[in-house]
Amino acid sequence: MVIKAQSPAGFAEEYIIESIWNNRFPPGSILPAERELSELIGVTRTTLREVLQRLARDGWLTIQHGKPTKVNNFWETSGLNILETLARLDHESVPQLIDNLLSVRTNIATIFIRTALRMHPERAREVLATADEVEDHADAFAELDYNIFRGLAFASGNPIYGLILNGMKGLYTRIGRHYFSNPEARSLALGFYHKLGTLSREGLHDQVYDVVRTYGRESGEIWHRMQKNLPGDLAMHSR
């Protein structure tokens, strides 16, 4: 087990998460007693208690007053906030995880972008207009792309879409910094934002579905060509 966390709390958190992932503490099992676990990891019981509370909030554990702490099946109890952690734990599955993430983005974007352009066109155009001043480099485009999708999600009037994008932010922007290092990807994205702006101005809301789907397919083709050179630190994150 290789743990790169810098603080005692970060070390304890990664130790427990990796132990769950590697079935040292399998789903459905009971964690060792607090005293035993703190000695095993090498942190104070106060630090361990804080870590356990945080992991419980993220869905990894269930803490019940007066009862042992139970390990959850995190696939059933956690949220999008653990995406980066999953990518870090299983490097071989990162391409599939990213494919799934981008597929979800495209599927829900066909709904919230159409709604935003139809119900709140002025707000949608304000969001899309931010692309006019973007600097031509990967970091700027990664931030822009996330903010445009998130902005349109909230412009749809249904904040749940925005919350979903919030949950994707960490891994989404890390992917974006690699993806948008390709000039072809940046050019395709600008064309996509421009098309959406045109559809909004002309009231062609029914064409949003096809435009978003086409962009998802074409950007996916670029991404798949780039997957052979995924940076090793794509999902690295330490507390």
Swiss-Prot record:
Keywords: Activator, Cytoplasm, DNA-binding, Fatty acid metabolism, Lipid metabolism, Repressor, Transcription, Transcription regulation. PROSITE patterns: HTH_GNTR (PS50949). Gene3D superfamilies: GntR ligand-binding domain-like, Winged helix-like DNA-binding domain superfamily/Winged helix DNA-binding domain. It is found in: Cytoplasm. Residues 6-74 form the HTH gntR-type domain. NCBIfam families: fadR_gamma, PRK04984.1. Homodimer. Multifunctional regulator of fatty acid metabolism. This is Fatty acid metabolism regulator protein. It comes from Cronobacter sakazakii (strain ATCC BAA-894) (Enterobacter sakazakii). The gene is fadR.
